């Protein structure tokens, strides 16, 4: 049964994301800590079927995720949109060039719902830059269950053999 928009708002979206990653066979999550991601990372770390790898910079995280994926392990990358903006060269010359199907779960800062002055410029350019990099991406729809959206993004990455960035709101990932 498909849930209504109101029912979707009652579901704990971060738990649904975590359950979906496990159900889809993800075994590694590479992350750069962010204010929105902190508690989510704690829950990933507590999952026996998921290995959390913390990186210090987004381009480093991308390289680690691609390396783990090269080893045959289904991998998700968890970063902030500002970090993806800084990893353009690695995205084009590594992840896209060698067709790594990496699911990128990206906290989307600087939107009208996150109108903090220093995030706003990053929010305004995120999607145009992703388009310019030919980075496949989508924003989550808060009125639809998040699990199927994560699954659709992961499936696209696999089928197209490319990274896919799913842009997440605060309610999607804040525990």
Model-derived regions, located:
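Thiamine diphosphate
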Residues: 2-175
């Amino acid at each position: 049964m498909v849930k209504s928009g109101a029912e979707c708002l009652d579901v704990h979206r971060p738990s649904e994301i975590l359950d979906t990653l496990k159900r889809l066979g993800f075994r590694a999550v590479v992350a750069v800590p962010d204010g929105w991601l902190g508690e989510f990372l704690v829950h990933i770390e507590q999952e026996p079927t998921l290995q959390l790898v913390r990186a210090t910079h987004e381009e480093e995280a991308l390289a680690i995720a691609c390396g783990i994926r090269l080893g045959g392990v289904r991998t998700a990358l968890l970063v902030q949109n500002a970090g993806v903006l800084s990893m353009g060269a690695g995205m084009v010359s590594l992840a896209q060039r060698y067709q790594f199907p990496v699911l990128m779960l990206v906290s989307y800062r600087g939107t009208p719902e996150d109108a903090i002055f220093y995030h706003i410029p990053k929010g305004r350019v995120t999607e145009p830059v992703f388009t310019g990099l030919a980075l496949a991406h989508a924003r989550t729809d808060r009125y639809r269950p998040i699990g199927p959206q994560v699954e659709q993004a992961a499936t696209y990455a696999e089928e197209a053999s490319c990274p896919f960035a799913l842009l997440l709101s605060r309610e999607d990932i804040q525990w």
